[in-house]
Amino acid sequence: IYLLADVGSIGGGWLSSRLIARGLSVNAGRKIAMLVCALCVTPVSLAVFADDLLVAVGIIGLAAAAHQGWSANLFTLASDVMPRRAVASLVGIGGMAGAVGGMLMAKYVGAALEGVGSYTPIFVGIGSVYLVALLISHLLSPQLEPARLPA
């Protein structure tokens, strides 16, 4: 699974760079790459129904690769839209939010598993959250225009 995640991280960055090099805008290149990654995560919803361990591992591996490709593009969005002096702060705030989200997710997963007795709602949620996040990202910044911060 971790090797697939490594490939996904490199592949996600490669895909957006390739799309931009072929003439797409940075906005289109990043968002198309993120859409591809989001779509590759969606099958993880089916992992809980896999009868074969290797099939489940393959589905989860694909999702891990797609997550890393998504992350590569998400972190690059910061440098696409923010001035150089603000990138580290933005990424740091995002990292903090991710850490808090991870803590909350651990609590939610435990509660869901205890209440429902199954990982199904967690995997279904994971399978859809990337598409929702991409939609929110697009609604917040449809053109990925550079932010203008006061000096």
What do the PLM-derived regions correspond to, one by one?
Residues 42-50, 124-151:
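Multi-pass alpha-helical transporter architecture, strongest
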Residues 8, 12, 101-105, 136:
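Discrete transmembrane alpha-helix packing/kink hotspots characteristic
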Residues 84-93:
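Loop-to-transmembrane helix entry/capping segments in MFS-fold secondary transporters
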Residues 3, 61, 65, 92-100, ...:
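Transmembrane alpha-helical cores of Major Facilitator Superfamily
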Residues 15-16, 20, 108-117:
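Interfacial helix-cap and linker-helix signal at transmembrane-aqueous boundaries
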Residues 27-74:
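C-terminal transmembrane helical hairpin of 12-TM major facilitator-type secondary transporters
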Residues 73-81:
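Intracellular helix-loop hinge segments at the cytoplasmic ends of transmembrane helices
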Residues 1-20:
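Transmembrane alpha-helices of Major Facilitator/SLC transporters
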